[in-house]
């Protein structure tokens, strides 16, 4: 029941911004039901093909190169493996060559459909401009896929149903949750950090957790009795003494 135009635009920016090389980039969309998935892929694919790719400092460029040749090879290797595993390569970004930058580390926007949970393109963090579409047949199945994933940094639900949004936000085992927000990075006075394999250290970064990280706790236990009495105290009660 999501606004499809909004969901498609959100996926574009969240998946392909910074060439997908950021910890909060989305790498998978769980489109509930085949009709929803068909409409989503049909609307998204031409936008991915139309991405303007080049040097980041060139006017109008929407996506630049990945960081190293090794990253380019690794990302294209994931696309290769996804295709071998049975995913539909709807938009293929492999082998992209730009005039004047033939040796550049460019990978075009890639869209994979009919991905399944056992595929490495879904299980692993690719850190590249690759978006996988899975097709769970119900809300419960989609939520369970998120719950079962190894990583738990961020997730989002796109819906007009407030009950579904509330259920998702309260029950999901993910550190940062968006409701109709594709990249749920909170403002600085809230904590930033994931759960499960996406957790780092024992505190999150921002908010009160950040203050705690830079705080060394000290406990002081004191009494100011009315008069000093002799004798040992054998319990923790401040008002009881045994002489």
Task: Mark where each language-model region is.
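Glycine-rich nucleotide-phosphate-binding loops and adjacent flexible coil segments
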Residues: 129
């Amino acid at each position: 029941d999501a606004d499809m135009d909004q969901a498609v635009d959100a996926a574009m920016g969240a998946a392909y911004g910074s060439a997908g090389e950021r910890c909060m980039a989305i790498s998978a969309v769980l489109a509930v039901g085949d009709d929803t998935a068909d409409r989503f892929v049909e609307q998204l694919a031409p936008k991915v093909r139309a991405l303007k790719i080049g040097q980041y400092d060139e006017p109008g460029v929407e996506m630049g190169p990945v960081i190293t040749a090794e990253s380019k090879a690794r990302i294209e290797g994931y696309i290769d493996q996804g295709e071998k595993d049975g995913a539909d390569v709807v938009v293929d970004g492999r082998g992209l060559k730009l005039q004047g930058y033939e040796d550049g580390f460019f990978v075009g926007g890639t869209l994979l459909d009919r991905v399944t949970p056992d595929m490495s393109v879904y299980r692993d963090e690719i850190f590249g401009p690759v978006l996988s579409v899975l097709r769970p047949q119900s809300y419960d199945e989609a939520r369970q896929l998120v719950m079962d994933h190894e990583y738990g940094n961020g997730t989002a639900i796109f819906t007009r149903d407030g009950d579904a949004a509330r259920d998702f936000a309260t029950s999901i085992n993910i550190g940062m949750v968006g409701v109709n927000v594709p990249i749920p990075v909170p403002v600085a006075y809230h904590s930033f950090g994931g759960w499960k394999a996406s957790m780092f250290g024992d505190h999150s970064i921002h908010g009160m957790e950040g203050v705690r990280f830079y705080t060394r706790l000290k406990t002081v236990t004191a009494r100011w009795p009315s008069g000093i009495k002799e004798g040992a105290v054998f319990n923790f009660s401040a008002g009881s003494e045994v002489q």
